[in-house]
From Swiss-Prot:
It is found in: Cytoplasm. Its EC number is 2.7.7.7. Signal peptide: none annotated. InterPro entries: DNA_pol3_alpha_NTPase_dom, DNA_pol3_alpha_thumb_dom, DNA_pol3_finger, DnaE2/DnaE/PolC, DNAPol_HHH, PHP_dom, Pol/His_phosphatase_N, Pol/histidinol_Pase-like. GO terms for biological process: DNA replication. Belongs to the DNA polymerase type-C family. DnaE subfamily. DNA polymerase III is a complex, multichain enzyme responsible for most of the replicative synthesis in bacteria. This DNA polymerase also exhibits 3' to 5' exonuclease activity. The alpha chain is the DNA polymerase. This is DNA polymerase III subunit alpha. It comes from the Bacteria.
């Protein structure tokens, strides 16, 4: 439907006019190209921002549409600094359409959009005419839509003010100012357009036809209307909601535009001018082939270049990293070989002298140094050669400044008490990075490759991401701001979009669909890799969704509208890690806004910032580093030992013993159930085992873990029989991982050793394999086979080896990253092995806001024999605290108390000594500081137990709060000296809390049960259970198939949801004093189980256990405590295994035979390594046997008969022998 009429849309909103523009860039540009195929052009003019400018520019250019970067500004009625509503439209701001004519115009748009946010934000980001005049060069201005100032004055019949404003705009823009004419069929436009036409004639101004597009096609109007209702939080039933007056705000064809502004009335001028303006606008953004890296200048010591200073720091660093090999004497000898007299002075003088040596001299020396390919031993000469090679690549690619900047902020952080990770990603493969302190793991010891990080065959900006303690990360960003200038550093923006589930729920709300129904619909959308599938795909694969659309017309509309809105941007926010550092003020190139704390943030996202060649860094907050800080502090406080993580021995037997036992709870990367079992099976002996394990423990390579473990234990030989001619090359590379390719670096080394690739070329091969580029892969195969044949590997074997590498490339892991992160795993395990109490206290402190984690770690502490005590206002600290060999809850972990109140309690205790009573506590801490809700939580948590029984304390809060307030008031008014002080009233009498209530209160206040677990307070439940939750995996391990077990516990967190087949399912957490697990129930079992699923009640659960990497527990039936206690009884007899010799068995049998009856009998045998339960199938006794057995010294008791429950109300097979 292409048109030959010339026209360009110059006023178009996109998805970056958040919750207002419904035009997705791809759809928009495709439609523009379709409707104006000859010289298509389009202006992007989003409301008050430039969020999408770079993405729009790139996509438009790629699709053959000329991009015009614009901006619909909000102009303040008076000053941008005004913070009061004026009389103008929308509270004192008006619209104005601005287009960038050239790169200067683009820069001025950036500055205006930035200052609107940084200086003029009040409800909207506003500019004013002062800065408009300041930044008008290179801009074309259109007079605007109905919301602009001139049209508003016309509508108010204030033509003198309209003309005055027109003259002011002319004084700013001159012949770059045009009259904007729009016609959406609105009566207001008809009135305005006639006056605008007269102004154009009077002042000789060009007129321009625009359409204020907010969506792409006319049929998108309904979806746009819904989008506006999402923005305004209204529904379609609300007559007062904000909406557009008609459905004409779409991207019209040239013919439709001319129909709205007939030629007889308007002529060709408004249309021809759009084409003329499109021709005039020619912004050439420095992206793609024109992009240059914009690395800021690092502040250098006098007389140094960036390359020299990086060399100097590297040579200094090598002395400190390898003192046994790189010595001052070695450096003096190197200088002599270079023909330079070594200077007098310290190591810095030597490093400076080496740094000043010309590159040509180094090149000559490198020819005499041992080659780097296949280095077996890292001698001083080899280390120097590797460093020189890396430096030459870094210099040739132009990145010394990059390394200097990164090492500067990392070393500043370390020097100012901010914990920094040992490395992240491929940067750990660089010796230079290690020498200058960027990374903290030795790349030579672990065989890490520089080319995996910085490839001399492929010029691209290095990417060094850094982990900092998540509590201290912001300090480092602030340092960078101060170092390079507040105007040159900002965090990077990002955009949250309407994913399928969110879009569906938002649209459903607007249509008035009940919240519960909307949630049900959203839950039907499958989630893959953590992301919900698009609605279009979901409809195809989920028949329930299709059925809902067919049976309910409103739901069909909701889903269809949601599909149109899906993928639109919903909000702007701050990227979790990205920081940009610029050489010049950022607003020369990138628009800025502010986050909620007032800090500058780029309006562009990460991709746009990188596309412009700006230096982007990732400053990540890693909680493990915060944990290690906390552990070091607690160990120092508790044991007087100063932990230095950089000096820990990496072969500590105690650490590897802990890992081999599977005690990995809280150990970085190793604490999941499946990983724990794998670590226990592997029994690692060296750090390299951990590196391999975290690399293999991912979908795909996991299948090789059993082989790795067997070979690790010598149960299976390492064989290279499949590649007999290549074995001599493969063995040195793969022996470390028992012949199994694990790392990407191994691909590179094999290509290098077997086929003669340089490591840089080998990295290109790795990338090609990962991206499956067919043509490129064929070229590489030919090259690989040719090189292998030259090294004695036959063609057929070389092809097989290439096939193996190609298959492996899909799951090979980055060894540099694995090594750096495995070092953190080792460090956390070391702390747990040597300081378990301090380890658990630190872990609990950093996870105090996650009650599930706290509960899990408290159970682990108790399993290690470490008591965790409730909080105490006279003993607790802010966080969890070590007292002897026990852990005391921190006050900040008590719900409703908050950090400020916790600190106030500690400060008052420090100032006035321990609290003597509840009254003393209340008198010293006013209710404004510690409110009644916080006080109730403190009592329920046990933090005030020293002052009395919890029931009495709760009952006394009201009268004692009144007494405390009156006492403080008397003190303020000076009455205390005149009259005797009113004594503290005694605690109110109240019945003590029963144990169940007390435990429930503890969970309410602390998120967990501390003094015990309610399940132990319900006699009968535990006795029937097959095992505890903690024992479950061990219990079912040797049982065949999908064993059935009985589990008892408290029900927590019940979630019910529909299944794809139209039924219902539920998930719930079952907890006992040893742990908690998730139980799933669906199918026929759901109807019987669901009514009994209520939170905080005890249940007995018959479950089928599916064994795998993680156990899956499926409920078949459940019983309440009452049902359990009412069930038929059995007799249980406890007996020590030592008494079950021939004589003991005969004695017990004769006692049981004396009183025959109907009760089944179970024998619980207590042994040195646990206990076992046996059903005596042929024996039935009467209740009288109980007394006889007790009289004879046996421990015997009546319990509910397990067989009743194992049958699941008739739903399960009867076991011949029941091993509980």
């Amino acid at each position: 439907m292409g048109s030959k009429l010339k026209f360009a849309h110059l006023h178009q909103h996109t998805q970056f006019s958040l919750l207002d523009g419904a035009a997705k860039l791809q759809d928009l540009l495709k439609w523009v190209k379709e409707t104006t195929p000859e010289d298509p052009a389009l202006a992007m003019t989003d409301h008050g921002n430039l969020f999408g400018a770079v993405e729009f520019y790139k996509k438009a250019t790629a699709m053959g549409v000329k991009p015009i970067i614009g901006y619909e500004a909000y102009v303040a009625a008076e000053s941008r600094f005004d913070r009061k509503r004026g009389k103008g439209l929308d509270g004192g701001y008006f619209h104005l359409t601005l287009l960038a004519k050239d790169f200067t115009g683009y820069q001025n748009l950036v500055r205006l959009a930035s200052r609107a946010y940084l200086e003029g934000f009040y409800e909207k980001p506003r500019i004013d005419r002062e800065i408009l005049r300041e930044h008008a060069q290179g801009l074309i201005a259109l007079s605007g839509c109905l919301g602009a100032e001139i049209p508003q004055f016309i509508l108010q019949d204030r033509l003198d003010l309209a003309e005055a404003r027109l003259n002011e705009d002319l004084s700013i823009f001159g012949d770059r100012f045009f009259i904007e004419i729009q016609n959406h069929g609105l009566p207001e436009q008809k009135k305005v357009n006639q006056v605008l036409k007269e102004f154009a004639r009077k002042y000789g101004l060009g007129m321009v036809a625009t359409n204020d597009g907010h969506y792409v096609r006319k049929e998108d109007a309904r979806a746009h209307e819904v989008l506006l209702a999402i923005q305004s939080k209204t529904t379609l039933d609300d007559p007062e909601r904000w909406r557009f007056p008609c459905d004409e705000f779409y991207v019209k064809t040239p013919e439709e535009m001319r129909a709205m502004l007939p030629e007889a009335e308007w002529g060709d001028e408004p249309f021809d001018n759009t084409v003329e303006i499109a021709r005039m606008c020619d912004v050439d953004l420095p992206i793609g082939d024109k992009m240059v890296y914009r690395i800021p200048r690092f502040p250098l010591p006098e007389g140094r270049t960036e390359a020299q200073y990086l060399r100097e720091l590297t040579f200094l660093g090598l002395l400190r990293r390898y003192p046994d090999r790189i010595t001052e004497a070695f450096y003096r000898e190197v200088l002599r070989l270079l023909g330079t007299m070594p200077p007098h002075g310290d190591e810095r003088a030597l490093a400076e002298a080496l740094a000043r040596v010309e590159e040509k001299a180094w090149e000559e020396l490198r020819k005499r140094l041992p080659p780097l390919e296949g280095v077996r031993e890292w001698t001083a000469e080899a280390i120097l050669h590797r460093a020189l090679y890396e430096l030459s690549v870094i210099e040739r690619m132009g990145f010394p400044g990059y390394f200097l900047i990164v090492q500067d902020y990392i070393n500043w952080a370390r020097g100012h008490g901010v914990s920094v990770g040992p490395g992240r990603g491929s940067a750990a493969g660089s010796l230079v990075a290690y020498a200058v302190g960027i990374t903290n793991i030795d790349p030579l010891r672990f065989g890490l490759l520089f080319e995996r990080f910085l490839n001399p065959e492929r010029v691209s900006m290095p990417d060094i991401d850094t982990d900092f303690s998540d509590r201290e990360r912001d300090r480092v960003i602030q340092y960078v701001r101060e170092r390079y200038g507040e105007d040159k550093v900002a965090q990077i923006g990002t955009f949250g979009s309407l994913a399928s589930k969110a879009a569906l729920k938002d649209v459903a709300r607007v249509y008035g669909i009940p919240h519960k129904k909307a949630e049900e619909l959203a839950k039907l959308i499958p989630v893959q890799f953590g992301k919900p599938k698009p609605l279009q795909e979901a409809i195809q694969v989920v028949p329930e969704l299709r059925a809902e659309m067919e049976k309910d017309e409103r739901i069909r509309q909701v889903i269809e509208v949601a599909m149109r809105l899906e993928g639109l941007n919903r909000h702007a926010s701050v990227h979790a890690a990205g920081v940009v550092i610029a050489a010049e003020p950022l607003t020369d190139l990138v628009p800025l806004m502010r986050d909620q704390e007032g800090r500058p943030v780029t309006q562009y996202d990460m991709g746009a910032v990188e596309a412009l060649g700006l230096l982007k860094m990732d400053f990540l907050g890693l909680r493990t580093l915060t944990f290690l800080d906390e552990a070091r502090r607690i160990v120092k406080e508790s044991k007087g030992v100063e932990l230095d993580y950089d000096r820990l021995p990496l072969d500590d037997p105690k650490t590897f013993e802990l890992l081999s036992r599977g005690e990995t709870k809280g150990v970085f990367q190793l604490e999941s159930g499946g990983m724990t079992a794998t670590v226990r099976g592997l029994k690692p002996r060296r750090l390299e085992d951990i590196i391999a394990l975290v690399s293999l423990y991912r979908p795909g390579p996991m299948e090789h873990i059993p082989t790795y473990i067997r070979r690790h234990h010598g149960q299976e030989p390492v064989s290279y029989a499949e590649f007999p001619h290549a074995e001599k090359y493969l063995r040195p590379i793969l022996d470390e991982t028992y012949g199994i390719p694990v790392y990407q670096e191994q691909i590179m080394q094999i290509a290098s050793q077997v086929a003669g690739y340089s490591l840089g070329e080998a990295d290109l091969l790795r990338r090609a394999m990962g991206k499956k580029r067919v043509e490129e892969m064929q070229k590489h195969r030919e090259r690989f086979v040719r090189g292998a044949k030259e090294r004695g590997v036959p063609e057929e074997e070389a092809n097989r080896l290439f096939d193996m590498l190609e298959a492996f490339a899909n799951y090979g892991f980055n060894k540099s990253h694995a090594a750096a992160y495995s070092l953190l795993s080792y460090q956390t395990a070391y702390v747990k092995a040597h300081y378990p109490v301090e380890f658990m206290a630190a872990l609990l402190s950093v996870e105090r806001h996650d009650s599930d984690k706290v509960a899990e770690y408290i159970r682990d502490a108790r399993a290690l024999g470490i008591p965790v005590l409730p909080p105490d206002v006279n003993r607790s600290g802010f966080d969890f605290k070590v007292v002897g060999e026990e852990i005391l809850f921190g006050l900040s972990a008590v719900k409703n108390v908050g950090e400020m109140a916790a600190r106030a309690i500690l400060e008052e205790r420090e100032r006035g000594g321990p609290f003597k009573s509840l009254g003393d506590f209340l008198k010293r801490l006013p209710e404004q500081v510690v409110n009644k809700r916080a006080l109730e939580s403190l009592v329920k948590a046990g933090a005030l137990d020293a002052f009395g029984d919890r029931a009495r304390l709760l009952a006394s809060l009201e009268p004692l709060l009144r007494w405390a307030a009156e006492t403080r008031e008397r003190g303020r008014s000076g009455l205390v000296g005149l009259f005797a002080e009113v004594e503290e009233p005694p605690l109110v009498e109240a019945s003590p809390l029963d144990e169940i209530t007390m435990l429930r209160y503890e969970k309410e206040a602390l998120g967990i049960y501390v003094s015990g677990h309610p399940v132990l307070r319900y006699p009968g439940l535990r006795e029937v259970a097959s095992c505890t939750i903690e024992e479950l995996s061990e219990f079912v391990r040797e049982l065949p198939g999908k064993p059935k077990v009985l589990l008892s516990g408290m029900v927590e967190e019940v979630v019910r949801k529909p299944t794809r087949s139209g039924g219902m399912m539920a998930r719930f957490t079952l907890s006992d004093e040893t742990g908690a697990l998730e139980v799933v129930v669906f199918g026929r079992a759901y109807e019987g189980v669901s009514p009994k699923l209520k939170e905080d009640i005890p249940l007995l659960v018959l479950a089928e256990v599916e064994k795998g990497e993680e156990l899956r527990v499926l409920a078949q039936a459940v019983w309440t405590l009452e049902e359990v206690l009412e069930a038929p009884k059995a007799l249980e007899v406890e007996v020590d295994h030592a008494l079950l010799d021939e004589k003991g068995v005969a004695r017990l049998k004769s006692l049981l035979d004396e009183h025959p009856g109907s009760l089944p009998v179970y024998l619980r045998v207590l042994g040195p390594f646990g206990e076992a339960l046996f059903a005596l199938r042929e024996v039935r006794v009467g209740e009288e046997a109980l007394g006889l057995l007790e009289a004879e010294g046996y421990r015997a008791y009546l319990v509910p008969d397990r067989e009743v429950f194992l049958q699941g109300n008739g739903g399960g097979p009867k076991e011949e022998v029941v091993p509980f």
